[in-house]
């Protein structure tokens, strides 16, 4: 397994009415080791939908802000509730990549893994492949896109680029 390509693939703005599950299932059917990280706004999903998604073992739900506002400041209590009550993983990506220093420190204190834009100078996880482009030749990729097409990197629009990965690619959770 050491020579196989490893990919951390994530999509922003996953929710109950904007989920592209049919396309995600197509990827799962093509790639035996497929896993995906989906960043969602908690208020955009019903409890029954979250319960359904949690049963799909190759999907990891991550926090994409609390209400998708620019530079929002989510309280520590709200961040704890997301993990304890709704089962979100301690992985956070700020909406619009805008993360205040206060929020950054709060997330670190709560032991969240913080996703940052590649241009951000702070410590965090940064993607190295925008899926609107063909995958680079690197053996380890952190691919990023959106569930819907917002910047040319929507799942449907970039599907062919993902399909260019070797079928034995090992997908990982963040």
Pin down the residues of each PLM region.
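Metal-dependent polysaccharide deacetylase catalytic core of the NodB/CE4 family, i.e.
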Residues: 33-104, 139, 143-147
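Short acidic, S/G/P-rich loop/turn micro-motifs used as interaction or catalytic elements
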Residues: 14-17, 69, 147-152
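A conserved mid-domain beta-alpha-beta active-site/ligand-binding segment of alpha/beta enzyme cores
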Residues: 127-153
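Boundary/entry segment of secreted carbohydrate-active catalytic domains
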Residues: 1-26, 34-35, 170-174
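C-terminal domain-boundary segment and adjacent tail
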Residues: 2, 31-32, 148-174
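His/Asp/Glu-enriched short active-site or ligand-binding loop at hydrolase and phosphoryl-transfer sites
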Residues: 103-136, 169-174
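Alpha-helical scaffolding within the catalytic cores
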Residues: 19-24, 44-54, 118-136
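Well-ordered, non-membrane alpha-helical segments in soluble/globular domains
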Residues: 18-27, 75-82, 152-165
């Amino acid at each position: 397994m050491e020579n196989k390509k490893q990919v951390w693939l994530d999509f922003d703005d996953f929710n109950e009415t904007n989920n592209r599950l049919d396309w995600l299932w197509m990827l799962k059917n093509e790639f035996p080791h497929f896993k995906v990280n989906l960043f969602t706004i908690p208020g955009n999903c019903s409890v029954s939908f979250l319960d359904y998604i949690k049963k799909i073992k190759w999907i990891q739900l991550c926090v994409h802000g609390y209400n998708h506002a620019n530079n929002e400041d989510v309280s520590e209590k709200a961040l704890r509730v997301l993990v304890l009550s709704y089962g979100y993983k301690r992985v956070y990506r700020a909406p619009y990549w805008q993360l205040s220093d206060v929020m950054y420190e709060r997330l670190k204190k709560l032991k969240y893994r913080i996703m940052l834009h590649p241009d951000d100078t702070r410590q965090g996880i940064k993607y190295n492949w925008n899926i609107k482009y063909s995958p680079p030749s690197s053996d380890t990729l952190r691919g990023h896109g959106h569930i819907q097409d917002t910047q040319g990197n929507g799942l449907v629009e970039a599907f062919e680029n993902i399909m260019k990965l070797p079928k034995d690619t090992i997908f990982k959770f963040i």
